[in-house]
């Protein structure tokens, strides 16, 4: 893990860290200053004082290993035990460009230890004395790998990447307490100190938050005798947390989460680490072309907004005269939501389609307003976002060492176990705008091969529901959306497809197919008829009719969904095909919670007091009365009136309906999305470990939900694409009886023209 900097707020970027180092290392007459105006000297003096005061009591419990013999001896103890905990301390969150300040170690039978490696004087930048050379730690880690030492870590991917990029050694994680914590409970904080305090009966003073204390100060600047007091405790915490987790994942008989942890989450750590280290190339020339194009487009779209506003020049002037304290600028600030709201609602007299946002100016509201000004604003914002988020941003975040984009992939990015990515978010690159994705390409001489699971989630739905008709359709190679549309709309199968047999477009067929796709995805994502109707641009009644027809055609789907909800209400969780749990405690909430306010009626009897009475509670008859009233209400306004009346009587009522409904919507989706995520991860593990793909110089680069993107030499593209799809399809066979299908495409750039191979 990133040690000192691992838990910093979003400020901790490479750019900010580099700037802090640059400011602190300049030779100036006065002591340099950092964020907040305080000098580095003052900040480090504060850090030393606070750490020594709070953690000085641990000085005798930790070892500071500053000579080679001590380091060799400690690693010998680890190898003899066969296991050990390790943590790295660095000066930034980028494993490629960071400086390795030191390593923290722990093995039972020894004190926790800190090995300083690259601490420097914050004044001169000179390496501090009595530190251990990289070669010594590298040699010891290599020996540990040869002895197959089981390493215990927290956020193992980071430490593996640091050891590889800074020492040239790939350590093999055996237990990652961060991932184990996610498998045990995805709904809580997974910071090491939070978990240790909660589960390991920690006696430490965890009230001290170090993030703010160290903010902006590279750990390499911290004096060694202070730094080790902060750092050396982490591997002990990691070890103790591992022991707790191991007990619950094994002895407490949790086969599902344990299987997911040991067979999916742990094996995929090296896969993700390799993806992040490899990075992806950016076509800087093409990015510059796009920047020029979209900057010109943004000017045109900005001009269009003012052309539309000129149509209402007299109305705008009239508003200004009647509102002498108005905030409208000249010209009107199109980036100001307050000014745009004045134009839309006060000057043009429009009514917001969202009652909860009567003066909203967001994308969803502008879309539904559907006026010339709202459309012009949407077009302008679209271009501005493409420029600021992608086109102009990407060239500025290329890694200075590699010249590539190296994003971070988060294995438990979603509570369902689905990946997410950040810095940058490669999963959020627009798919509808192919130009943006075309900025990313393979290395010179390499091509990109993208392969995605076709209809991964509907196939998973067919398997989980055990609907024979849906399963058979996939076995027969049918387009499931067109096939279901045939059943619902009572028209031939070919009339429900986007293209006719002769290759010509079929608009009506596409409409039928798209409507069914929206329904199936809506069902899987817990959307109601109203939400589906908005997506299909039809009435709620019409959408509900189609949904009912779907359930009539596939009754086992409805039966399975009902059973999922019933089991969730009973047990508080749902489970994927591979055993990953998604805990949804809100499903089990009472519809209403009653709390006695001061002076309210209760069952407490002060004249007949005994200990068994406990705290005062709302009288059951009062609870029954208000529950009956609430159940009879129609809409939120009536319910709010009843709750207000109860409050006047000294009773606070909490309506849990929203929380319950939200949790219920997640039940089916968590199983489908979680199972699909497990499937994709197993496919990635198989691809990464495949010896033939290694021989063909194939490297995983990106993962975007149901799609993986690799690169390989162009000459190997045909065999790689065939091998890739075979491995992906095979990854599902262990648990999913519905045949999976994968479509592979070879291109020079992401979403580029397909190459013949």
Predicted features along the sequence, with ranges:
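Conserved "right-hand" nucleotidyltransferase catalytic core of DNA-directed polymerases
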Residues: 2-127, 145, 187, 195, ...
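Acidic beta-strand-to-loop metal/phosphate-binding motif
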Residues: 85, 148-156, 448-450
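Structural signature of nuclease core domains in nucleic-acid processing machines
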Residues: 97-149, 155, 160-177, 704, ...
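Conserved beta-strand -> loop -> alpha-helix junction used to position metal-binding or nucleic-acid-contacting
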Residues: 169-194, 477-481
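Feature representing long, continuous alpha-helical segments
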Residues: 434, 458-459, 463, 482-483, ...
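Generic long, charged, amphipathic alpha-helical segments
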Residues: 480-511, 577-703
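C-terminal structured "cap/appendage" subdomains that terminate the fold
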Residues: 690-746
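Short, low-order "capping/linker" segments at domain edges
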Residues: 750-757
């Amino acid at each position: 893990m990133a040690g000192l900097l691992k838990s910093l707020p979003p400020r901790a970027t490479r750019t900010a860290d580099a700037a802090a180092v640059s400011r602190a290392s300049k030779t100036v007459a006065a002591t340099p200053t950092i964020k907040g105006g305080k000098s580095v000297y003052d900040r480090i003096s504060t850090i030393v004082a606070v750490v020594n005061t709070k953690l000085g009591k641990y000085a005798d419990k930790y070892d500071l290993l500053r000579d080679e013999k001590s380091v060799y001896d400690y690693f010998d103890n680890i190898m003899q035990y066969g296991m050990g905990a390790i943590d790295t301390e660095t000066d930034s969150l980028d494993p490629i460009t960071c400086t390795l300040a030191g390593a923290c170690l722990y093995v039972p039978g020894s004190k926790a230890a800190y090995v300083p490696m690259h601490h420097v004087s914050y004044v001169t930048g000179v390496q501090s004395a009595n530190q251990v050379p990289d070669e010594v730690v590298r040699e010891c880690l290599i020996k540990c790998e040869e002895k197959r030492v089981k390493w215990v870590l927290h956020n193992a991917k980071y430490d593996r990447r640091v050891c590889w990029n800074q020492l040239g050694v790939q350590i093999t994680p055996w237990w990652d307490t961060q991932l184990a914590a996610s498998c045990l409970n995805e709904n809580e904080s997974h910071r090491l100190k939070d978990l240790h305090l909660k589960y390991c009966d920690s006696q430490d003073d965890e009230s001290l938050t170090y993030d703010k204390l160290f903010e902006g100060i590279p750990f390499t600047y911290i004096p060694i005798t202070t730094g080790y007091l902060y750092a050396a405790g982490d591997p002990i915490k990691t070890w103790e947390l591992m022991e707790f987790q191991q007990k619950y994942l094994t002895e407490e008989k949790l086969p599902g989460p344990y299987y997911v942890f040991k067979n999916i989450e742990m094996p995929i750590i090296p896969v993700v680490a390799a993806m992040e280290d490899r990075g992806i190339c950016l076509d800087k020339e093409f990015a510059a072309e796009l920047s020029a194009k979209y900057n010109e487009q943004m000017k045109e779209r900005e001009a269009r907004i003012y052309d539309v506003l000129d149509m209402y020049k007299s109305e705008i002037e009239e508003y200004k005269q009647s509102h002498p304290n108005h905030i409208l600028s000249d010209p009107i600030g199109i980036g100001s939501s307050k000014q745009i709201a004045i134009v839309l609602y006060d000057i043009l007299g429009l009514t917001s389609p969202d009652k909860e946002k009567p003066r909203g100016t967001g994308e969803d509201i502008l879309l539904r307003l559907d006026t010339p000004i709202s459309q012009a604003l949407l077009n302008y914002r679209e271009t501005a976002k493409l420029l600021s988020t992608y086109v102009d941003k990407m060239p500025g975040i290329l890694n200075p060492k590699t010249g590539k984009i190296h994003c971070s992939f988060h294995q438990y990015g979603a509570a369902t176990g689905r990946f997410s990515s950040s810095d940058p978010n490669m999963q959020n690159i627009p798919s509808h705008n192919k130009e943006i994705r075309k900025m990313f390409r393979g290395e010179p001489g390499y091509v990109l091969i993208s392969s995605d699971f076709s209809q991964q989630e509907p196939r998973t739905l067919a398997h989980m529901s055990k609907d024979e008709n849906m399963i058979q359709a996939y076995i027969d190679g049918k387009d499931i959306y067109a096939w279901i549309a045939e059943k619902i709309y009572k028209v031939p199968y070919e009339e429900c497809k986007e293209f006719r047999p002769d290759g010509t477009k079929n608009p009506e067929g596409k409409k039928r197919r798209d409507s069914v796709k929206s329904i199936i995805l809506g069902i899987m994502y817990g959307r109601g008829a109203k939400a589906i109707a908005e997506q299909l641009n039809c009435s709620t009644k019409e959408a509900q009719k189609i949904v009912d027809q779907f359930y009539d055609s596939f009754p086992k789907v409805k039966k399975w969904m009902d059973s999922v909800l019933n089991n969730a209400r009973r047990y508080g969780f749902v489970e994927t095909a591979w055993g990953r749990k998604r805990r949804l405690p809100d499903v089990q909430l009472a519809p209403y919670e009653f709390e006695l306010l001061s002076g309210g009626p209760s069952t407490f009897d002060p004249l007949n007091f005994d200990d068994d009475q406990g705290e005062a509670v709302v009288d059951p008859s009062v609870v029954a009365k208000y529950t009956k009233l609430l159940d009879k209400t129609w809409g939120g306004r009536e319910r709010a009136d009843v709750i207000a009346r109860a409050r006047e009587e000294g009773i606070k009522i909490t309506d849990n309906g929203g929380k319950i409904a939200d949790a219920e919507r997640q039940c089916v989706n968590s199983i489908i999305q979680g199972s699909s995520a497990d499937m994709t991860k197993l496919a990635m593990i198989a691809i990464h470990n495949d010896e033939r793909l290694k021989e063909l110089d194939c490297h995983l680069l990106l993962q975007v939900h149901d799609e993986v993107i690799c690169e390989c030499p162009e000459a190997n593209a045909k065999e790689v694409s065939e091998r890739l799809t075979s491995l992906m399809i095979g990854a599902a066979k262990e648990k999913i009886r519905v045949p999976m299908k994968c479509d592979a495409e070879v291109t020079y750039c992401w979403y580029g023209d397909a190459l013949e191979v």
